[in-house]
Amino acid sequence: MRAADQPACCRWSRWVVAALLSVLVLSFNGCTTPIRADRTTARAAYRELTKTALDGQCSHDARTVLHRHDLEDQFRKSPVECLRRLHEQACLDDRGDLLYALAELNYLHGERLTRSVKAGDVRAARDFHLAAAIYAWFFLTGQGSAASPDPFDRRFRVACDLYNRAVALGFAEGTRPHTVVRWSRGARALVPGTVRIECREPAGDWTLNDIEKFLPADEYILRGLTVRDRQSGLGAPLIGVGKTIEPRRYGRRVPATLVLRAGGDARAWSAGELVVSLEVYSTYESDSIELDGRTIPLETDTTAPLAYSLNDTTVWRLGTVQFFSPEERIRTD
């Protein structure tokens, strides 16, 4: 049949097919392709390689675990159910990458809840932060048959920071930036299961009864000081604000570190048998802890409490009065 004898609809269909084929050929032969490598600056590439839940993004390591279990879409649509399913996998699979992913994804979901306009979501955020701290502890200490990660593993360094932040946020009360860190004995119902919390009194020249409140040192930027005395390690650095007993007697501001130890594994957690121990250390008394025969340094910050105590302009005025007075006008505990 000649082209002139063909129906108009057939000729039109052929034109459409030819046009579509032309578009496809041009898309593949053009300047962009579906898969490619774009040259960029070293700084931009570093940001892409090192993105984690700590800066509000899902790392490549956590995304790999989600992809392996076909849970990427579910984490976007139903994060709680996704975290529950990943925990079930962690009970069957001792690989450390599952624990790392659970630590990061719980932290990421907790951070998203803190930005919610619903009061219930903000309160629930600390439960996911606590779960993140427990998973990070499992990952760092080696749960089950999984060995502790190599210190050169990038996930090891990120997990330490996740743990330190999540320990404080797991017991935070109030809304940011006015949260205080307050903990007590008892049970906490988390998505994987209930955990029992035990507390240990600090050993040093102050007790918990001497402290009015603890503040997260990580949420303070210091001004007017040349350096910040900070030691890297494990634990949440805190500012302990002492109680003011008399009007002219100022409570001390002391540096402390809160450490969480989890005695058990993911399976014990699912069974409701996980015990979490909270230990608070005075920075002036302890700078490390013992863990399975190893000495682990504590994360400490001695400058933040000092700078915080100088926030009060009254201290500056009284300091001037005290300098020119032969009598003791300022007393501390």
Report the location of each language-model feature.
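Sec-dependent N-terminal signal peptides
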Residues: 18-23
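C-terminal motif of bacterial Sec signal peptides marking the signal peptidase cleavage site
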Residues: 27-30
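Flexible, membrane-associating and regulatory peripheral segments of lipid-active enzymes
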Residues: 32-89, 93, 98, 104-333
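Bacterial N-terminal signal peptides that target proteins for export
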Residues: 3-17
